[in-house]
Every structure is written in C-alpha cells, then in structure tokens.
C-alpha cells in the first residue's frame, strides 16, 4: 500500500499534498479553515448540481421551479436550504481564513495571498449570481442595483450594463446567463484553490509565532487530518442546526415574493456577507466614488503585504497591532450592521465614520504602529 501511495503518479501527488506533507508542529485551530472551505465548496457543488437538475432559468418559471423543489422533489427542501445556508458557512470560513492570514502575517507569501484575493472575488461573484436565481423581489432588485453600479464607469458604463443585462433591463437573458456563470464558476474556484495550495506548498505553512518552523515539522496525516476532522464535525453540526431549525434566519423575507419590476421593495439589501461592502458603497454620496470605495474595500487586501513595515511577521508578540486588528474587526461588524439599516440618520453618519475608520486603520494606522513597535523592540 505504501509503495502505491509513494510511486503511483496520481497517488504520489495526493500523498505529497495531504499525507506526508511536512507541517509546523504548533499550528492552531485557526489553520483549520482551509480544509473547511474545501468542504464547503464540495457541499455547494453537490447540492447545486441536484438543484440544477430541477431548476429552470426562465423568468416565468424560475420562482415556481424553486417552490417545486421545496414542495415536490424528494428532500428538495433540505438540498435547497443546505445550498443557501452553505453559502453563509462558506463566507464565515472565508472571513475567518482571511482574518487568520492578516493576524499571523500569512500575506507575506505573495503568490498564495494574491491567488486568495482572486478566489475571494470569484466566490463573491458566484454568490451574487446565485442570489439572483430564485427570482424573488430581492433577487431582481439586488441584480438591478448591483449591475447598475457599472454604469458609473465613464464613457463605456451604460453600454457595459446593457451588455451584461442582454437588453435594456434585468430580464430573461440576464437570468439565463447568470445561471450559466453560477454553474461554471465553482469549478473555476476549485481549480484556483488547487493553484492556491500549489503556491502554499512551495513555501510551506506559516505558524502562529511567525518564525521559521523548518527545524520542527510533523507529517500532516494523522495529526492534522484528525484535527481538521473536529472542525468538519463542528461545521456540519452548525450547518445542519441552521438548516433544520431556522433555515430562513439569514435570508430575506422579500425573496418569498415573486420578482415584480413595477414594485420596488422598501429596503434593497444584499445577503449579510456583502453588507460591509454595501455600507461602504452607500457611505459615499457620489456614484462613481461609491463604486471605487466598494472595489477598494476588498482590493485593499492586495496592498497589505506592501504596507507591512513590521520586523516580525506575526502579531502574536505585537500588542499595539493586536489592538488595531480587533478595532478593525469591530469596525467590520459595525459596517455589516449599518449595511442592513435604512438610509437615514444616525445610520448614514455611523456608516461614513466606520468607512473612514476602515481605510484609516489599514492604510495609515497599521503601518505607523508597525514602525513604532520596531522602535520599541530596541528598548
């Protein structure tokens, strides 16, 4: 058996990636989220495949086909809710994974980090297009509002929006192409995840201390396979608890109303995992400025390795940076809350303040604190 594992071309590749992979001996449970993201992606692809067997991407039948899945298809309701809440779990793991990378300085592995940012954008695009498919009120108006943002691009904006729509409004052509893209993108995400792992295994994993662990490595299996299994069990228990007890907790009630182009919902908002970016978008009165702030709020991750002025990789021994980091986390929670509130005072002011703080911490306060901590090291 060992010979096959180490000699067969395909088995050898799997062996080097998941079995005999040398891993640092001190990585904590924060390193579990990579494998949990892989599990989430598998759940999404499998449940999505079964949903696609019964779904019809036509404006006249899309809403009723989702109803049919929930009412008439064997276990259709659980497949649908696993898929919808699986997306929420995906983003929870994704935010934890990125947060871990920021805290422990994993962004110094440039290729891995940059592929990760591309993955984040791809997952966000996939989730957005998936939200449009049930063709409820929030699906339709969410698609209209978000795609309309592209019209802020000078000269070519309006033409670009109509090209994406396939007409002069969000209609059948839009729904059909969104379904096609929503189906193909998870497989592209899986391929990008392989590249992400490929680059990670070039450098080896980071560890909480942020110093080289070359002198103290242990095999990935059985130590970290067992450790990951605990994360898997916790994730599945959380997901099934959500699906079986309160499947609509994270959804929007407006999406149970069929899409009506003549009736605008009182508050148009995306799914909870986009609310932080949506709050930043809304905090700027100018349309183009808002779009630039929205893109910058995520693209700013690409700047972080270049703004890293500290002499230590990890924040483990940098208390001032830790304070700023947790301020940033609190700020993101505030933005998420504001994104779900109506556009009126005091929410407008809170949103604008939180948006300024977000960019201020990442672009100015973090690099300056790093330099200060470098000075304190010499004391």
Swiss-Prot record:
Cofactor note: Binds 2 heme b groups non-covalently.
PROSITE patterns linked: CYTB_CTER (PS51003), CYTB_NTER (PS51002)
This protein's UniProt keywords: Electron transport, Heme, Iron, Membrane, Metal-binding, Mitochondrion, Mitochondrion inner membrane, Respiratory chain, Transmembrane, Transmembrane helix, Transport, Ubiquinone
Cofactor (UniProt): heme b
Family recorded in the similarity comment: Belongs to the cytochrome b family.
UniProt-listed SUPFAM superfamilies: a domain/subunit of cytochrome bc1 complex (Ubiquinol-cytochrome c reductase), Transmembrane di-heme cytochromes
Protein residues bound to heme b b566: 97, 196
Origin: domain of life: Eukaryota
Subunit structure: The cytochrome bc1 complex contains 11 subunits: 3 respiratory subunits (MT-CYB, CYC1 and UQCRFS1), 2 core proteins (UQCRC1 and UQCRC2) and 6 low-molecular weight proteins (UQCRH/QCR6, UQCRB/QCR7, UQCRQ/QCR8, UQCR10/QCR9, UQCR11/QCR10 and a cleavage product of UQCRFS1). This cytochrome bc1 complex then forms a dimer.
Keyword Electron transport assigned: yes
Designated name of the protein: Cytochrome b
Gene Ontology molecular-function annotations: metal ion binding; ubiquinol-cytochrome-c reductase activity
Gene: MT-CYB
Binding positions (a ubiquinone): 201
UniProt entry tagged with the keyword Isomerase: no
Function description: Component of the ubiquinol-cytochrome c reductase complex (complex III or cytochrome b-c1 complex) that is part of the mitochondrial respiratory chain. The b-c1 complex mediates electron transfer from ubiquinol to cytochrome c. Contributes to the generation of a proton gradient across the mitochondrial membrane that is then used for ATP synthesis.
Other comment: Heme 1 (or BL or b562) is low-potential and absorbs at about 562 nm, and heme 2 (or BH or b566) is high-potential and absorbs at about 566 nm.
Location of the protein in the cell: Mitochondrion inner membrane
Transmembrane region(s): 33-53, 77-98, 113-133, 178-198, 226-246, 288-308, 320-340, 347-367
Residue positions binding heme b b562: 83, 182
GO terms for biological process, alphabetical: mitochondrial electron transport, ubiquinol to cytochrome c
Membrane topology term: Multi-pass membrane protein
GO cellular component terms, A-Z: mitochondrial inner membrane; respiratory chain complex III
Major location category of this protein: mitochondrion
